[in-house]
Amino acid sequence: MSKVCIIAWVHGRVQGVGFRYTTQHEAQRLGLTGYARNLDDGSVEVVACGESEQVDKLMKWLKDGGPRSARVDRVLSEPHRPGEELTGFRIRY
């Protein structure tokens, strides 16, 4: 299996609904490193690194709508090379 990193931007009703916390829980369950943080435009940025199959599972979870309290309208993503070593999956502010 190969290691990959992606950066994704999740748009919709994704702030103020526990989206970052449930994303963190799901990413940790999948053994991924990275972070989730709110952006000023109302979206959430997610960086996820790990085995490609596990990253794909997180992306599917995001595209399927994430937590029940959220409404995901669109998820954009691209390969990413973090400028720092990521340990654990964190919520950034």
UniProtKB/Swiss-Prot annotation:
Domain of life from the UniProt record: Bacteria
EC number: 3.6.1.7
Keyword annotations of the record: Hydrolase
GO MF annotation list: acylphosphatase activity
Pfam families named in the record: Acylphosphatase
UniProt catalytic activity: an acyl phosphate + H2O = a carboxylate + phosphate + H(+)
InterPro entries recorded: Acylphosphatase, Acylphosphatase-like_dom, Acylphosphatase-like_dom_sf, Acylphosphatase_bac, Acylphosphatase_CS
Active site: 20, 38
Boundaries of every Acylphosphatase-like domain copy: 5-93
Enzyme class (EC, first level): hydrolase
Transport found in the keyword field: no
Family: Belongs to the acylphosphatase family.
HAMAP family from the UniProt entry: Acylphosphatase_entero (MF_01450)
The protein's name in its UniProt record: Acylphosphatase
Lineage: Bacteria, Pseudomonadati, Pseudomonadota, Gammaproteobacteria, Enterobacterales
